[in-house]
Amino acid sequence: MVHHWRKPKAGGKGLSLNDAVGLLKNSENDTVTLSIEREGEADLIETEVTKEKLAAIVADGKMLDDKIGYLAISEFTGLTSEQFQKAYQSLQDQGMERLIIDLRGNPGGLVTAVCDTLRQILPEGLIVYTEDTNGKREEYTCDGDTPISIPLVVLVNENTASAAEIFTGAVKDYGIGTIVGTTTFGKGIVQNTFQLSDGSVVKLTIAHYYTPLGNDIHKVGITPDVEVELPDDATSDVQLEKALEVVKGLESAE
């Protein structure tokens, strides 16, 4: 069946495509009626569609050639750890022997989310610790039940920030993987948003975080083990190509 676009109407008025999509998203009804135009047919088919909330995909994987798994994490939210676990397990079930985790463009997110994700691959020990302005220290640790034992590469760039740098820093400090790409953003602070009595909000830095070896990456970033730029005029993903080359040359810890 071929679907053709016909300018939709609401209340007898024509709508743009963007307006129609917005109407579907913002409708308070559980179901919406869609009219489908078929090629060569004058009559429209009307069907009711039940609206459901879809969970955003923030961690997804696929198998590349040579039994190399590829797992991209776009953000560390409340969904990340579970989605990572499912994607990681799926790749293992497919016979993965090497893994590339792509954190390029990942702006960070929740400290708890990145720690829950890292607990699936780190050995026993410290994941990250924070120190507030009074010097109070809070540690996040891993019991090391499921340390990764296959060759690992983590892809990063200048937009890899905050919680994504916690991930990168832990992998680097424990020596369980090789970092490939460009120097990360350099956001090593914890911030909270507070609402004032007049309704305005202010964002305050409440703590700094440090990698397992005590490195403060704020305004510095993490330098990759293998540096490779991705030029604006690149016709292929040279960073991923380098990651593939590197991961193929790594020895398994098994």
Where would I find each of the regions flagged by the language model?
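Short acidic, Pro/Gly- and aromatic-enriched capping/linker segments at domain boundaries
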Residues: 196-198, 203-207
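Conserved functional hotspot residues or short segments at active or partner-binding sites
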Residues: 217, 239-254
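Cleft-lining beta-strand/loop regions that shape enzyme active-site pockets
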Residues: 1, 6-13, 18-187, 191-194
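Short, surface-exposed, low-complexity cationic segments
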Residues: 224-239
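Short, acidic, Ser/Thr-enriched surface-loop or helix-capping motifs
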Residues: 211
